[in-house]
């Protein structure tokens, strides 16, 4: 006689069968998500709640688990996107130990072929925010990591756009490194005769002399040592140009002081800047020939009156060379031993001294800005461009062409119509706002004489925060500047190049990303 199964065993078997049925139904729904949409809303909600209660009975734990799962999913997408963005051209240039200038001239016999079209377009999983037009996008450009396809193509073409500037003369301040250096190369490769000012003329000459096409334009380049903090020197330089040059078509007021560097930052260049002239290579000496030449007749008498007191003799003869002026200690921090903050032999991508200070000008509040720095910033960013634009206008009017340009290189820090304004670096904001006001006020006057004056924002090229903070932002916030120095250079010379190529000369505007923006 067979024993009857216990009632509890039968119940277990029935429950197991029901569980297997439930699993099969859930797997069917997982394979075809549209099935759940066919359920009445009440049953669908009960199903969601039942599954959730089984997975995590506690509502708080369930919410936390859901948030954690979403965060993990986002992290996975971001890791994928980081790989895509990491492969862009602008990221590759940033990883290079030393920035090299793009060679925009193809070799002889080269035939253009767009190999990029042969590649499958790269897509991001998370929608990106375009730096220029602010629209969302997912297709990633081969060079830019923060622009939509349309903006990226436009900006990429601008990097290599040239114009025929043969026979024209351009003045560029701050043309030794970074944006100024790239702008100088662009003007030279357009055929212009270029006058460059910098505090470190020998270092500047060596940099230009290292370009592969140096021989093509070296005879059209002259470099002058000039410290824009010293207003009498700026006046004297303008007087010298008036006496030695027959024409001037373009002025690019690029030099600026954003982050003040103490003398130790520049110390590594002093040996080269103060060495005997015969120790310099011949090509470097040629670029500096006009800078070292004696002043023209009447030059000294015309500039001596610039002294605070006319009884002071030898005004310019007693002034230190511009490079040595960088070693004058003006603030208490300039006297501190700083070898650990500016380690010898450690240079950045632009072959400039590494600055390891934990705090710099970019972090200062109003009550923290030294008076010396306040004055320096105004002198370099606003006063010097004012003097240059004013004193050299007669030189610009010596020739009849009405397609001349003045570019006052500005920044969004100087913009009043801006929704968000930080409380930091008010002195640089003031200086750029003053520069913009000069453009806004005087552009019409200069336009009447065929000179087109504009302010131009370079774009976001550099993270000005101290090195440690900037490095941490890359890791923690995935922050990378959206542009590089070639983009910045293309922006500041675009009023000239676009004007010459199109015949449409913009004037009296504040230009951002090649287009007018609010003041």
Language-model-detected regions and their locations in the chain:
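N-terminal alpha-helical interaction blocks
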Residues: 19-127
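A glycine-rich helix->loop->beta "capping" turn
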Residues: 121, 218-222, 240-253, 265, ...
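Canonical Rossmann dinucleotide-binding motif of NAD(H)/NADP(H)-dependent dehydrogenases/reductases
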Residues: 156-201
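Conserved glycine-rich Rossmann-like NAD(P)H-binding loop of the short-chain dehydrogenase/reductase
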Residues: 190-208, 222, 250-255, 260-288
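Active-site-adjacent segment of SDR/Rossmann-fold oxidoreductases
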Residues: 245, 441-451
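C-terminal helical subdomain
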Residues: 293-344, 472-519
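Active-site helix of classical SDR
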Residues: 389, 427, 431
């Amino acid at each position: 006689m067979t024993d009857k199964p216990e009632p509890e065993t039968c119940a277990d078997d029935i429950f197991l069968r029901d569980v297997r049925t439930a699993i099969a139904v859930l797997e069917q729904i997982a394979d075809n998500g549209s099935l759940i949409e066919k359920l009445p809303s009440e049953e669908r909600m009960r199903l969601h709640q039942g599954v959730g209660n089984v997975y995590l009975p506690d509502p708080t734990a369930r919410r936390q688990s859901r948030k954690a799962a979403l965060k993990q999913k986002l992290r996975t997408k971001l890791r994928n996107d980081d790989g895509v963005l990491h492969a862009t051209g602008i990221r590759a240039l940033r990883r290079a130990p030393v920035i090299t200038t793009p060679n925009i001239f193809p070799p002889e016999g080269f035939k253009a072929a767009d190999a990029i079209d042969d590649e499958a377009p790269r897509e991001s999983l998370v929608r990106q925010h375009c730096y220029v037009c602010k629209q969302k996008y997912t297709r990633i450009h081969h060079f830019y990591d923060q622009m939509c396809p349309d903006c990226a193509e436009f900006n990429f073409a601008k990097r290599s756009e040239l114009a025929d500037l043969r026979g024209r003369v351009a003045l560029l301040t701050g043309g030794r490194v970074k944006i100024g250096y790239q702008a100088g190369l662009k003007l030279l490769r357009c055929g212009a005769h270029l006058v460059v000012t910098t505090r470190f003329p020998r270092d500047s000459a060596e940099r230009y002399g290292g370009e592969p096409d140096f021989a093509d334009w070296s005879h059209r380049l002259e470099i002058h040592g000039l410290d824009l903090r010293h207003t009498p020197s700026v006046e004297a330089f303008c007087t010298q140009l008036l006496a030695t040059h027959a024409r001037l078509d373009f002025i690019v007021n690029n030099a600026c002081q954003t982050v003040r560097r103490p003398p130790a930052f520049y110390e590594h260049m002093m040996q080269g800047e103060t060495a005997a002239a015969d120790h310099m290579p011949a090509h470097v000496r040629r670029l500096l020939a006009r800078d070292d030449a004696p002043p023209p007749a009447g030059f000294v008498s015309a500039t001596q009156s610039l002294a605070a007191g006319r009884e002071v003799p030898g005004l310019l003869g007693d002034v230190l060379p511009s490079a040595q002026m960088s070693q004058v200690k003006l603030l208490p921090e300039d006297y501190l031993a700083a070898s650990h903050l500016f380690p010898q032999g450690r240079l950045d991508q632009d072959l400039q001294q590494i600055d390891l200070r934990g705090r710099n000008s970019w972090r200062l509040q109003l009550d923290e800005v030294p008076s010396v720095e306040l004055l320096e910033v105004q002198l370099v960013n606003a006063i010097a461009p004012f003097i240059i634009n004013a004193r050299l206008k007669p030189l610009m009017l010596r020739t009849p062409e009405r397609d001349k340009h003045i570019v006052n290189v500005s920044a969004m820090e100087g913009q009043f119509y801006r929704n968000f304004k930080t409380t930091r670096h008010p002195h640089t904001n003031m200086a750029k706002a003053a520069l913009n006001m000069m453009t806004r006020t005087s552009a019409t006057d200069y336009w009447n004489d065929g000179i087109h004056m504009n302010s131009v924002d370079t774009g976001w090229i550099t993270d000005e925060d101290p090195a440690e903070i900037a490095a941490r932002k890359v890791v923690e916030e995935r922050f990378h500047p959206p542009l590089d120095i070639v983009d910045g250079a293309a922006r500041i010379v675009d009023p000239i190049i676009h004007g010459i190529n199109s015949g449409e000369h913009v004037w009296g505007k504040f230009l951002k990303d090649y287009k007018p923006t609010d003041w």
